[in-house]
Amino acid sequence: SECRWFMGGCDSTLDCCKHLSCKMGLYYCAWDGTF
C-alpha cells in the first residue's frame, strides 16, 4: 500500500512516508524531525 504523505490520515507511523510519523491522538502524518 502507498505511504501516507504530510497531513495524511494514519493509524501508526508505519502508515506514513519516510521522515514522517503518525501523531498519536491527532491521527495524521507529520515530520518526525529526521532528514
From Swiss-Prot:
Q: Which UniProt keywords apply?
A: Amidation, Disulfide bond, Ion channel impairing toxin, Knottin, Neurotoxin, Potassium channel impairing toxin, Secreted, Toxin, Voltage-gated potassium channel impairing toxin
Tell whether Transmembrane is among the UniProt keywords. no
* UniProt xrefs under InterPro entries: Huwentoxin-1
State the Gene Ontology terms under molecular function. Answer: ion channel inhibitor activity; potassium channel regulator activity; toxin activity
GO cellular component term of the entry, any: extracellular region
- Function according to Swiss-Prot or TrEMBL: Selectively activates mammalian TRPV1, the capsaicin receptor, a non-selective cation channel expressed by sensory neurons of the pain pathway. Is less potent than VaTx2 and VaTx3. Interacts with distinct regions of the channel than capsaicin, since it only acts on the extracellular face of the channel, and capsaicin binds to the cytosolic side. Also activates avian TRPV1, which is insensitive to capsaicin. Significantly inhibits potassium channels Kv2.1/KCNB1.
What's the protein name?
Tau/kappa-theraphotoxin-Pc1a
Q: Which organism is it from?
A: Psalmopoeus cambridgei
Top-level taxonomy = Eukaryota, Metazoa, Ecdysozoa, Arthropoda, Chelicerata
